[in-house]
């Protein structure tokens, strides 16, 4: 807040809870800049409510599917995001989910808390040995994916990836393949692609059917990339071994079918929730606002 105050503009500060649509339109009216998070849906109507003085919308996130970027561009409003500063925190959480799902950590915790009598056995809650030659497949190969790949290589995993810019070859121990090959060959499939019209429900029933029955799915990208109904069906039928989700198609609502699904680890969109990381995201968002309001190019413009 101090950094924003230094700009010499009046501030309107929201509360901890996401604003309603009417509150958002009220608060953004007459603003020259808006710092928002993924809970705020900035569409053409909200932009119109802001008025002609709005110059920049700084999204405190890498993904920006909550903002109508085309409508903003039409109105001459710069949209920015916060890439880079959250790569390691998100990669850490992604790998934590890989281990939690594949080694059945949450299942074990729930089992003990249930109070059931138990006796240790050599085949109790067997999971995937990720460091015994398991293959990690990464859908989408941006900065966060590269950070996940580095962690996977430290666990001696074989890493496959898909990329819009290349479909074959190797780079830093990562082999690039097409999506079908990746799905069929991977022991863990990690979704790290942005949500676009082309990637919505990229992981559908057909994609899940291509995966090994022993494989796990992890999504820390955007909820809409995975068809949640198809995932529930696959888990319930045992067509894949398990999954872990940090993001959901209709946040903050989580489909009750997901809550009831077996072998599924869920976290509430907290992959970047390291204290230092969140501070850095906020600072970068404010730096983008400061740049635009002082006539300089935005540091992280979204196009």
Regions found by a protein language model. Give the residues of each.
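Glycine-rich Rossmann-fold phosphate-binding loop(s) that bind the pyrophosphate
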Residues: 141-142
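Phosphate-binding beta-alpha-beta segment of Rossmann-like dinucleotide-binding domains, i.e.
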Residues: 75, 83-135, 150
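Rossmann-like adenosine-cofactor binding region
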Residues: 29, 42-46, 160, 164-257
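Phosphate-coordination loops involved in phosphoryl transfer and adenosine-cofactor binding
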Residues: 54, 132-135, 205, 214
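C-terminal helix-to-coil terminal segments
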Residues: 73, 80-92, 251-303
């Amino acid at each position: 807040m101090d950094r924003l105050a230094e700009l010499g503009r009046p501030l309107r500060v929201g509360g901890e809870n996401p604003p309603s649509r009417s509150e958002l339109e009220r608060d953004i009216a007459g603003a020259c800049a808006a710092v928002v998070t993924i809970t705020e849906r900035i569409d053409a109507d909200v932009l119109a409510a802001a008025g002609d003085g709005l110059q920049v919308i700084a999204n405190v996130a890498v993904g920006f599917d909550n903002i109508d970027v085309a409508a903003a561009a039409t109105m001459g409003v710069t949209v920015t995001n916060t890439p880079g500063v959250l790569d390691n925190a998100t990669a850490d959480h992604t790998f934590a989910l890989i281990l939690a799902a594949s080694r059945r950590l949450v299942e074990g915790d729930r089992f003990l808390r249930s109070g059931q009598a138990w006796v240790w056995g050599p085949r109790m809650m067997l999971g995937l040995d990720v460091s015994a030659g398991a293959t990690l497949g990464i859908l989408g190969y941006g900065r966060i994916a590269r950070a996940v790949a580095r962690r996977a290589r430290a666990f001696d995993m074989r890493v496959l990836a898909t990329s819009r810019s290349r479909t074959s070859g190797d780079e830093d121990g990562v082999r690039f393949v097409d999506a079908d090959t990746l799905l069929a060959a991977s022991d863990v499939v990690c979704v790290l692609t942005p949500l676009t019209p082309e990637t919505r429900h990229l992981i559908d029933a057909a994609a899940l059917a291509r995966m090994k029955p022993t494989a796990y799915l992890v999504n820390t990208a955007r909820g809409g990339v995975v068809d949640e109904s198809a995932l529930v069906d696959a888990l319930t039928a045992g067509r894949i071994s398990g999954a872990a989700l940090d993001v959901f198609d209709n946040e903050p609502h989580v489909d009750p079918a997901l809550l009831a699904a077996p072998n599924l680890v869920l976290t509430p969109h907290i992959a970047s929730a390291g204290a230092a990381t969140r501070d850095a995201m906020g600072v970068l968002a404010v730096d983008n606002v400061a740049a635009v309001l002082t006539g300089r190019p935005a540091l992280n413009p979204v196009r």
